[in-house]
Amino acid sequence: MSYKPIAPAPSSTPGSSTPGPGTPVPTAGSVPSPSGSVPGAAAPFRPLFNDFGPPSMGYVQAMKPPGSQGSQSTYTDLLSVIEEMGKEIRPTYAGSKSAMERLKRGIIHARALVRECLAETERNART
């Protein structure tokens, strides 16, 4: 079974047809690039996520002082990440690329939190 994306329905409204001779058509130079770069310039490849180490998720995680309730908040963070990931399952299955990317980032974040929880559990078991 192969995945086939659903094509958007053609937008044909009554009264609208192809542009006539008096309708201005934008040229390639007048349309801004979605990336904001110079047209024709190749953007360097940059991966969307990195699975080596904990993810940054757009913010810097603060270091917790020893003896704080870090494990409880890490576990709570993990539960909330899993809950958010659950909301992305159905849109991902329906073909949403943005939901798929959010789900990927959520999985990576959850894996990092699980590693933190396991490390905390091992530290507590040794003491």
From Swiss-Prot:
* Spans annotated as Interaction with CDK2: 65-107
Q: Which UniProt keywords apply?
A: Cytoplasm, Nucleus, Phosphoprotein
InterPro entries to which the protein is assigned, alphabetical: DOC_1/2
List, alphabetically, the Pfam families matched. Answer: CDK2AP
Tagged with keyword Nucleus: yes
* Assigned protein family: Belongs to the CDK2AP family.
The annotated subunit structure for this chain is:
Component of the nucleosome remodeling and deacetylase (NuRD) repressor complex, composed of core proteins MTA1, MTA2, MTA3, RBBP4, RBBP7, HDAC1, HDAC2, MBD2, MBD3, and peripherally associated proteins CDK2AP1, CDK2AP2, GATAD2A, GATAD2B, CHD3, CHD4 and CHD5. The exact stoichiometry of the NuRD complex is unknown, and some subunits such as MBD2 and MBD3, GATAD2A and GATAD2B, and CHD3, CHD4 and CHD5 define mutually exclusive NuRD complexes. Interacts with CDK2AP1. Interacts with CDK2. Interacts with MAPK1.
What is the protein name given in its UniProt record? Cyclin-dependent kinase 2-associated protein 2
- Where is the organism placed in the taxonomic lineage, from the top? Eukaryota, Metazoa, Chordata, Craniata, Vertebrata
Gene that specifies this protein: Cdk2ap2
